[in-house]
């Protein structure tokens, strides 16, 4: 399937990933340990996808390698550390029993790899060959689409905060795809994605008011947008950009 159509291959992975995660939710409840089935499904998918990439020697094509661009050109990735630490700005809390905590960490670690490889690796690369702008937009927006569900799931946040969450997710999507296609490595994207997800497990948000949350998200959006603009202006352009002008 991959050799016939890379885009179809990417879409199949997206569908399988979403279906398995949906099926995992009721299984987590039956097992009685949060994220247990989710972690198991993610581990299996991670192993299969990584083995496929290794077998077909596609690691470099999809960014599982170091970047040829020096770290100083990325400001030593300090803004990514700031973004990853955002969940801990209001303090640290241990809210779950240790079995669920372990399952959450394992699941989120794998989710970082899977979502970056599927959306910013497989999907972006398949589209970028023909239309770089479309690839950037689609890859970035899909990162924010999942947050729309917070508008309807009774998360407790008002619609303004939820919309800011979506804007932040889309902004992060643009940032990560810029790091990948300008820097040639998906590893920083995987690491920061996993870190943001994992640290959310230990976030202290019991006393976080809507106003504080809005300020929090606003700062993260500002850091993300500023960092993206700096990278787009200073990093070397990818050959795709020159060939599609």
Regions found by a protein language model. Name each.
Residues 84-89, 142-154, 199-213:
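Hydrophobic alpha-helical transmembrane segments in multi-pass integral membrane proteins
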Residues 114-140, 181-185:
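Membrane-interface helix/loop boundary segments of multi-pass membrane proteins
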Residues 1-13, 70-72, 185:
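N-terminal membrane topogenic signal
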Residues 22, 161-218:
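Functionally important transmembrane alpha-helices
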């Amino acid at each position: 399937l991959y050799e016939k159509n890379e885009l179809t291959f990417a879409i199949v992975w997206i569908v399988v990933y979403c279906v398995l995660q949906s099926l995992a939710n009721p299984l987590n409840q039956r097992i009685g340990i949060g994220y247990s089935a989710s972690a198991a499904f993610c581990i299996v998918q991670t192993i299969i996808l990584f083995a496929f990439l290794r077998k077909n020697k596609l690691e470099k094509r999809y960014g599982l390698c170091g970047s040829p661009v020096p770290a100083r050109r990325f400001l030593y990735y300090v803004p990514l550390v700031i973004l990853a630490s955002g969940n801990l700005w209001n303090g640290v809390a241990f809210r779950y029993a240790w079995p669920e905590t372990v399952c959450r960490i394992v699941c989120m670690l794998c989710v970082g790899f899977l979502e970056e490889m599927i959306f910013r690796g497989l999907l972006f690369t398949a589209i970028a060959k023909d239309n770089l702008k479309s690839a950037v937009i689609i890859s970035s927006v899909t990162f924010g689409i999942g947050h729309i569900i917070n508008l309807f799931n009774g998360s407790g946040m008002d619609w303004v905060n939820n919309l800011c969450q979506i804007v932040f997710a889309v902004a992060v999507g643009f940032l990560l795809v810029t790091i990948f296609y300008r820097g040639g490595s998906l590893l920083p994207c995987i690491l920061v994605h996993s870190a943001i997800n994992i640290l959310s497990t230990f976030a202290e948000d019991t006393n976080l008011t809507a106003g504080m949350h809005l300020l929090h998200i606003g700062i993260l959006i500002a850091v993300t947008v500023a960092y993206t603009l700096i990278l787009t202006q200073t990093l070397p352009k990818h050959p795709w950009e020159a060939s599609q002008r």
